[in-house]
Every structure is written in C-alpha cells, then in structure tokens.
C-alpha cells in the first residue's frame, strides 16, 4: 500500500542580513509559497532574527497545508562562496517552526555553496 501524501521542498536561505524561505514541489520547478524577513517584521535589523523566521515558517506552513502538502524536505543554505559557511540565526528557528506548524520534516540538507578554490577571499575574513 503506497503512501499518497504529497512532499514539498522547503528552501531556507539564511544569511546574517535576511532570511528567505520558499516552498516548491519535488522537482523545484513550481513555487508553492514564499516569504522573506522583510515581509513579516518592520525593522531592517530584525529581518534575519529567529522571530522573523518563525513567523515566516508559520505563514508558509499554513499556505502549503492548504495546498495539500503535508511533508517537506528542508534545504538550508548559508551565504557561502567567500562569505561565511554557517547559515544565519534564522535557519534553526525556521526548521523548528515548520515542524511545530504541522509539517512533517523528511531530510535536512545543507546546500551552502563552497568554492573549489575560487576567487581570493577578503583580507579581513578571518579564516
């Protein structure tokens, strides 16, 4: 007996200035819902905060559950490249809020871009 529940992919781009969340179908071709930190908080400094990520995740979960998606795989992305490899403060809060809002979490995957010896990093990067 096959499981007929629909899966989606929750893309969480968490930088230190903003957090952007998008939910797509399994192929990633069709966007089902999207939100960013600036759409849920007033202050620019709060866009990357865990509170903003929680509010965004609750909104997205509500929209996606209405469309019939019950389970999601989460793809977390940090700034990457020559910037930080670690995601911003909103990433963990977003995953927790998605689970708390009624979505079942499948896989959690880190898709931060890592250069294969790309351009020279800035001299004050601290690596």
Curated annotation (Swiss-Prot):
Signal peptide: none annotated. Pfam families: Ribosomal_S11. It comes from the Archaea. GO terms for biological process: translation. GO terms for cellular component: cytosolic small ribosomal subunit. InterPro entries: Ribosomal_uS11, Ribosomal_uS11_archaeal, Ribosomal_uS11_CS, Ribosomal_uS11_sf. The keyword Ribosomal protein applies. Keywords: Ribonucleoprotein, Ribosomal protein, RNA-binding, rRNA-binding. GO terms for molecular function: rRNA binding; structural constituent of ribosome. Belongs to the universal ribosomal protein uS11 family. Part of the 30S ribosomal subunit. Located on the platform of the 30S subunit. HAMAP family: Ribosomal_uS11. PANTHER family: 40S RIBOSOMAL PROTEIN S14/30S RIBOSOMAL PROTEIN S11 (PTHR11759). NCBIfam families: arch_S11P, PRK09607.1. This is Small ribosomal subunit protein uS11. It comes from Halobacterium salinarum (strain ATCC 700922 / JCM 11081 / NRC-1) (Halobacterium halobium). The gene is rps11.
């Amino acid at each position: 007996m096959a499981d007929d529940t629909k899966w989606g992919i929750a893309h969480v781009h968490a930088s230190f200035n903003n957090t952007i969340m998008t939910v797509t179908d399994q192929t990633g071709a069709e966007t089902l819902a999207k939100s960013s930190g600036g759409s849920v908080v007033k202050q620019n400094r709060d866009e990357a905060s865990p509170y903003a990520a929680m509010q965004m995740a609750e909104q997205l979960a509500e929209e996606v559950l209405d469309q019939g998606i019950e389970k999601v795989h989460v793809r977390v992305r940090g700034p990457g490249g020559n910037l930080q490899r670690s995601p911003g403060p909103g990433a963990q809060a977003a995953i927790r809020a998605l689970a708390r809002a009624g979505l079942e979490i499948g896989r959690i995957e880190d898709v931060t871009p890592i250069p294969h010896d790309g351009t020279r990093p800035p001299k004050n990067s601290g690596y």
